[in-house]
Regions:
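Nucleic-acid substrate recognition interfaces
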Residues: 1-172
Length: 172
């Protein structure tokens, strides 16, 4: 039997207008990176029968940030960008294992989210995420039990914002 289990706690967050702008930039960047590299993989696969790996795309993302037209990507947390590439890689692997259909492009009008794997803080009345200096208010209605692993910030179609906190707990 497994000695560890993962559990997620979901809470509503209440960002200010400035924080909403910041979060929307994060959502947009994650969507852009996913779609840009999905298009790149698709084009390569059609031309050569092969496509870049996650690691090759991570290197390409790093060099993209140095280009003038993609300079705005420096405002985005690098680990959040890498998480978008990991999601794309997982979608590709599932497609080739015939578990799902071919990965689709992400749309702005759909549910949006991004993952923050490190360098965040959970405070008594909110959270702090990288590149955003202010605290985002959060209503914690349950106690968080376990070792916190990552945060996922999401936005619904009704423009409500949530944080999902992934924790690792001992299996008893």
């Amino acid at each position: 039997m497994k000695d560890k289990i993962y559990k997620a706690y979901k809470f509503r967050i209440y960002p200010t207008k400035i924080q909403i702008d910041f979060l929307n930039k994060q959502f947009g960047a994650v969507r852009f990176i996913y779609n840009y590299f999905l298009n790149q993989r698709d084009t390569q696969f059609k031309e050569t029968g092969k496509s870049d790996s996650y690691y090759a795309q991570t290197k390409a993302l790093k060099s993209m940030k140095g280009q003038e037209e993609f300079k705005w990507l420096k405002e985005i947390n690098s680990q959040t960008c890498q998480q978008a590439l990991q999601c794309l890689d997982a979608a590709y692997l599932k497609f080739f294992r015939k578990e799902t259909a071919f990965p689709r492009f992400k749309k702005k009008k759909n549910y949006q989210s991004f993952c923050v794997p490190q360098h965040f803080k959970i405070l008594e009345k909110g959270i702090i995420i990288p590149k955003l200096k202010s605290q985002i208010k959060c209503k914690f209605h349950r106690e968080i039990i376990g070792e916190v692993k990552s945060l996922t910030i999401s936005k619904t179609l009704t423009r409500k914002y949530f944080v999902s906190i992934l924790v690792e707990q001992k299996n008893e």
